[in-house]
Amino acid sequence: MTKALSGFCCSLSLSTLVRSSSSHMDSDIVSSSIDRSQTAMPDALAFKSINDPIKNQINSCAAICVKQDDPCHFLRVLYESLITGGLAGVVVEAALYPIDTIKTRIQVARDGGKIIWKGLYSGLGGNLVGVLPASALFFGVYEPTKQKLLKVLPDNLSAVAHLAAGALGGAVSSIVRVPTEVVKQRMQTGQFVSAPDAVRLIIAKEGFGGMYAGYGSFLLRDLPFDALQFCVYEQLRIGYKLAARRDLNDPENAMIGAFAGAVTGVLTTPLDVIKTRLMVQGSGTQYKGVSDCIKTIIREEGSSALWKGMGPRVLWIGIGGSIFFGVLEKTKQILSERSQKSHNA
């Protein structure tokens, strides 16, 4: 009996010990599990908080890509480009036309020739009629082409996209720009009184091809000019935005536009002199072509004559670049905000 009772007590103690031990083990496991879960939760939350902006950015980029592939997006870009380009071109031409007239008269004058300072707005009305569609057409080609090339080319070749888009825009818009330029410069040099008379008499004397006099020299000047000016402008804006870590304001856009215009104006002055001489000569055919024009100018007037009118040209394009790109970016911003509001509504 004593042995049995002793064995029962021993068994009970052992059972209690086992249950106690098991209970402690279970509580340790649970406690350990809770500790691990509590430790893991901040990490998971931290990962989620880091991951959410990335997901949002990816989703945003994907939405933009889908939106850019939408034909409606292309039409909107085209529409906005036509408006911004046309408006900017007209504003610059109207504001700085007298400086352009002075530049043209200086370039045409031979040694000892007198510069006429009257009628500095001669031909402005007819010129604006051509500048509006020409500028609109340029940007209608430039902006969509630029956006398409930037999507295809790597980031380190963005300058190539700007160069190519500028050259292509210049080539397409030259269809309208050249006749406009021919009429403008002949009126600036006093050959005609009004734009309609100029068009009628040029076609009567020289045929329809007279409206495209100096077309080759125009492309020789304007394709490099358009490509360089817009490449310099776009690249400077990219660099400035990266350095400032914000969008540019209106004065900064105007300042960069002025610099890009002035630099490009200096580099392309000889090409502008050649183009002007060929366009204003009319049916007299003093120069037989680009190469003959260069040789004749150097032989008769010296190589310095190729830089005639550089001062007014740089002033005109520098100030013009400031106004042009300032108006351009502001108009783009206004149209973009209106489009965003209508989309959200």
Curated annotation (Swiss-Prot):
Organism the protein comes from: Arabidopsis thaliana
Membrane-crossing residue ranges in chain numbering: 82-102, 121-141, 156-176, 254-274, 309-329
Membrane topology field: Multi-pass membrane protein
UniProt keyword Phosphoprotein present: no
Protein name: Probable S-adenosylmethionine carrier 2, chloroplastic
Domain of life: Eukaryota
Tissue expression from the record: Expressed at low levels in seedlings, leaves, flowers, stems and roots.
Its job: Probable S-adenosylmethionine (SAM) transporter able to catalyze both uniport and exchange reactions through membranes.
Solcar repeats mapped onto the chain: 76-148, 157-239, 252-334
UniProt-listed InterPro entries: Mit_carrier (IPR002067), Mitochondrial_sb/sol_carrier (IPR018108), Mt_carrier_dom_sf (IPR023395)
Biological process according to GO: transmembrane transport
GO CC terms, sorted: chloroplast membrane
Chief location category: plastid
Assigned keywords, A-Z: Chloroplast, Membrane, Plastid, Repeat, S-adenosyl-L-methionine, Transit peptide, Transmembrane, Transmembrane helix, Transport
SUPFAM superfamilies in alphabetical order: Mitochondrial carrier
Presequence extent in this chain: 1-31
UniProt-annotated location(s): Plastid, Chloroplast membrane
PROSITE patterns the record matches: SOLCAR
Gene that specifies this protein: SAMC2
Family from the record: Belongs to the mitochondrial carrier (TC 2.A.29) family.
Taxonomic lineage from the root: Eukaryota, Viridiplantae, Streptophyta, Embryophyta, Tracheophyta
Gene3D superfamilies named in the record: Mitochondrial carrier domain (1.50.40.10)
